[in-house]
UniProtKB/Swiss-Prot annotation:
Its EC number is 6.1.1.15. The keyword Membrane does not apply. It is found in: Cytoplasm. NCBIfam families: PRK09194.1 (NF006625), proS_fam_II (TIGR00409). It is an enzyme of class 6 (ligase). CDD domains: ProRS-INS (cd04334), ProRS_anticodon_short (cd00861), ProRS_core_prok (cd00779). PROSITE patterns: AA_TRNA_LIGASE_II. This is Proline--tRNA ligase. The gene is proS. GO terms for biological process: prolyl-tRNA aminoacylation.
């Protein structure tokens, strides 16, 4: 492709609203442009990268036995109502009405549509297992789109769905697609980890996320320093044991703590260590209000609270709800004198506290010498806190460290969550009606492009891995007015294309500095500069990833490039 014919508008300055490297560079290099908040156009170079990621995805999905189809982006509300998610999915689901006031949603995901499709067509175990996938635009009304392609309102996604007669069949396909996902991200050149995850609004259990390691990731990965254990911090269980001290229990005492609300403030004011304080929070679990206790140096994990109750929605209670429940402000919450009809659950660590402190449910006061069970009753002790760095790894091997990650893929064992809700059944080999057993497997295709850009860049621009680079080789005649340089550039361009390489020829009448700056910004794997030594048959070859350059005789160029790109 000749650069003079390409639409690739570059920017010299970093856009003001672009916070992270991938967002900045994809805009500066002319790979994309913003249409509205969280909505982007892919320009020609960006589209080539996107298509290459799609191709890798398709190859690995088909190798794993999945078959491609395409479902509608607009979905009837009745299907979402049938599954129950019309009411529970939340405000991210884009909803609309047609001229006849019939309700629809723009597809945030396609479980309902695929389940409806398969239940009408697959009636026997003989047609199972079945794995179908699509690559299609998804829509989510993100409250705060940010980070370019990493959190948008419109994005390209590969979603696959598998249907089974037995759990063993689901397990087999799940493992196969888990491997396919590992292959996809490895082929894209990414440094990633597969981690144990929470299923969230998707439902089901046994789920893994594929996380690209990056400091700008919105998720925290907890991993062992000596084993392969890795989990989203939300899902990492705490296996610590807590020993209760033999300190004698003291008499409960209420003390004034004016303007002291946060644990750090109360701890310093009372000269009591944070790990002897009891942090009290009220959560709304579906429609039920529950008091949750953790140690002062720990944080409540709301996913664990959700799992205790098998709830659909868990969120912090509002100030108004707390006031109505306990007649106090949030900063004064405590478990003492809470009426018996209000359930209190606590993390295991709370049980070991002796002579601790807690809020008094009265503004400006706290209790000291608080002892669980003597001073208040707990309905259930369980694991409710986030794991911390330095904790024992849940697999018993090593200690926990943290890393940040960008989620690019997620695989779920949905079970019968959707098939039972939507009456999607089949006849088993005994002629009995059974619900279809399902799996679900998603990859953020456009997000993967951003994740690659986030991992592969330097101070000068993008540094694309060969497998996804828009072109393999960038040929740059320095002076297009020179017949020797221009003709040699054309000859190299044509011969490399004949050898199967994708080549970009910078045939613009620009200064050398502009051409080289754009070349670094685009980040193609190999740059061939045709300069003053063209008359001698010599060109300069530079490897973008390492910065290494060498003068090469043009007759040896193809072999030299083949060795670089092998």
């Amino acid at each position: 492709m000749k650069q003079s014919m390409v639409f690739s508008p570059t920017l010299r300055e970093v856009p003001a609203d672009a916070e992270i490297k991938s967002h900045q560079l994809l805009l500066r290099a002319g790979f994309m442009r913003q249409n509205a908040s969280g909505i982007y156009s892919f320009l020609p170079f960006g589209l080539k990268v996107l298509h290459k990621v799609e191709r890798i995805v398709r190859e690995e999905m088909e190798r794993a036995g999945a078959v491609e189809l395409l479902m509608p982006a607009m979905q009837a509300a009745e299907l979402w109502q049938e599954s129950g998610r019309w009411y529970s999915y939340g405000s991210e689901l884009m909803r609309m009405k047609d001229r006849n006031a019939r309700e629809f949603a723009l597809g945030a995901t396609h479980e309902e549509v695929i389940t409806d499709l398969v239940r009408d067509e697959v009636k026997s175990y003989k047609k199972l297992p079945l794995t179908l996938y699509q690559i299609q635009t998804k829509f989510r009304d993100e409250q705060r789109p940010r980070f370019g392609l990493l959190r948008g309102r419109e994005f390209l996604m590969k979603d696959a769905y598998s249907f089974h007669a037995t759990q063993e069949s689901l397990d087999e396909v799940y493992d196969r697609l888990y491997k396919a996902y590992s292959n996809i991200f490895a082929r894209c050149g990414l440094n990633f980890r597969a981690v144990i995850a929470d299923s969230g609004a998707m439902g089901g259990k046994d789920t893994h996320e594929f996380m690209v390691l990056s400091d700008v990731g919105e998720d925290t990965i907890a991993y062992s320093d000596t084993s392969d254990y890795a989990a989203n911090i939300e899902m990492a269980p705490v296996v610590a044991t807590y020993t209760k001290s033999d300190e004698a229990e003291k008499a409960l005492e209420k003390v004034a703590t004016p303007d002291q609300k946060a644990i750090e403030e109360v701890s310093a004011f009372l000269n009591i260590a944070a790990d002897k304080c009891i942090k009290s929070m009220v959560f709304k679990v579906d429609e039920k209000l529950v008091v949750v206790l953790v140690r002062g140096d720990h944080e409540v994990n709301d996913v664990k609270v959700k799992n205790v109750y098998g709830a659909s929605v868990v969120e912090l209670a509002s100030h108004e709800e707390v006031k109505a429940l306990l007649n106090c402000e949030v900063g004064s919450l405590g478990p003492i004198n809470v009426t018996g009809d209000i359930e209190i659950i606590a993390d295991h660590a709370v049980a070991s506290i002796v002579n601790g402190c807690s809020g008094a449910n009265e503004e400006g006061f706290h209790y000291v010498n608080v002892n669980p069970e003597r001073d208040f009753k707990v309905s259930q002790y369980t694991d409710l806190r986030f794991i911390q760095e330095g904790d024992q790894s849940p697999d018993g091997n090593g200690t926990i460290l943290f890393a940040r990650g960008i989620e690019v893929g997620h695989v779920f064992k949905l079970g019968t969550r959707y098939s039972e809700a939507m009456n999607a059944t089949f006849l088993d080999e005994n002629g009995k009606t059974q619900p279809l057993i399902m799996g679900c497997y998603g990859i953020g295709v456009s997000r993967t492009v951003a994740a690659i850009a986030e991992q592969f860049n330097d101070e000068n621009g993008l540094v694309w891995p060969k497998a996804v680079a828009p072109f393999h080789v960038h040929v740059i005649p320095v002076n297009m007015k020179s017949d020797a340089q221009r003709e040699m550039g054309e000859n190299i361009y044509n011969s490399l294309q004949e050898q199967g390489y994708e080549v970009l020829l910078d045939d613009r009448a620009e200064r050398a500095g502009v051409k080289f700056a754009d070349a670094d910004l685009f980040g193609l794997p190999v740059r061939v500069t045709v300069g003053k030594k063209a008359d001698e048959g010599i060109v300069e070859v530079k490897v973008r990833a390492t910065g290494e350059s060498e003068e090469v005789n043009v007759e040896e160029l193809q072999t030299y490039i083949a060795n670089i790109l092998k």
